[in-house]
């Protein structure tokens, strides 16, 4: 019989592998711990699917990362829900599943609305644009108008909003976006 001390040590070893960019070794150990429910009852137990997902994400195996982020998000209480949703959406985006990406970024926008957290609505806007949904692209990117100009991704999002307005022949709003960027 394997002791709890042994299982927790193996969990920490998997984390060490991850931090040393040895994602395959980390994933293998996390998966083994998950499959045998070795950490059941421990606070780290609920993080195992999240850790497996991140290993796949770092290995650029996006379909598997989506599966494991979903597994993590399906738990009743998750500590890193926003982060998991964003990475899941990123996986969809990278895999050119733009509609699914947009829907997942929109969940982040709805559940964690913060005007200065431009990333989810910038990415949602890009996703809608690549899915030929220009009105939804404008709607998502319009949130940047409430953000601080110092917010990360502010200039990129405002530029994309200006481009979206230009493509819709809305020259007045496009001008407003580009003017803000130029000032």
Could you say what each language-model-derived stretch is?
Residues 1-183:
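Acidic, polar-rich low-complexity tracts and alpha-helical solenoid repeat scaffolds
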């Amino acid at each position: 019989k394997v002791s709890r001390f042994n299982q927790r040590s193996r969990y920490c070893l998997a984390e060490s592998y991850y931090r040393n960019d040895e994602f395959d070794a980390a994933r293998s150990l996390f998966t083994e711990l998950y499959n045998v429910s070795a950490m059941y009852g421990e606070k780290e137990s609920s993080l195992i699917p999240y850790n497996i997902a991140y290993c796949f994400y770092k290995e650029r195996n996006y379909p598997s990362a989506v599966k494991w982020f979903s597994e993590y998000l399906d738990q009743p209480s998750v500590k890193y829900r926003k982060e998991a949703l964003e990475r899941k959406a990123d996986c969809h985006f990278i895999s050119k599943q733009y509609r699914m990406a947009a829907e997942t970024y929109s969940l982040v926008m709805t559940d964690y609305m913060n005007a200065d957290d431009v990333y989810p609505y910038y990415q949602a806007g890009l996703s809608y644009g690549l899915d030929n949904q220009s009105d939804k692209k404008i709607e998502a990117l319009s949130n940047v108008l409430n953000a601080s100009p110092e917010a990360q991704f502010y200039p990129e999002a405002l530029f994309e909003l200006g481009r979206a307005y230009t493509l819709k022949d809305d020259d007045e709003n496009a001008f407003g976006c580009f003017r803000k960027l130029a000032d």
